[in-house]
Amino acid sequence: RNINDDEILDFVAWTKEQPVHVRFIEFMPFTGNHWSNEKVFSYKEILDRVSEKFTYSKLHHEKHDTAMKFRVNGHCGTFAIISTMSQPFCSGCNRLRLTTDGQMKNCLFSKSEVDILSALRNGEDILPLIKQCVWEKEEALGGQFTSINGKPEVAEIINRSMIHIGG
């Protein structure tokens, strides 16, 4: 909010002549970024902003998509919104992340990591570790959030910063 939300319409306008797929991501809490719910420019607010100037339609959503996709009528490109905070999609997320130092995470917000690199270096089978990572996945948002009035609240995030996770 109040950082670059004034550029949303410009990015959507860019999809008119360019076959690009623009993604808007809600502000997410990570170590050091001073996140709060008040700073989140939500999925609904993004769509409200887009509808000030454009008529759009929702595109097909696959089971494990993390973004809701849209096309403005007459545009060759598309735009999408990753609504991590206002409309979490955790129940359909099938993503695993491998960090640059060989740790596997089952959620961007998860504080737990599984050491894949050491197993690879020791010639061990990594399939049990991948299964462990999947089974340890929390129900929502890495298990680090509580909900107050339907909005996720952060007590104290225990995690790497996004630049150290990759993504």
Identify the function of each model-found stretch:
Residues 4-7, 33-35, 67-74, 152-159:
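Short, solvent-exposed polar/charged micro-motifs at secondary-structure junctions
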Residues 134-167:
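Short flanking/linker segments adjacent to small metal-binding domains or redox-active Cys/His motifs
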Residues 4-21, 75-87, 160-164:
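Short, electropositive alpha-helical surface patch
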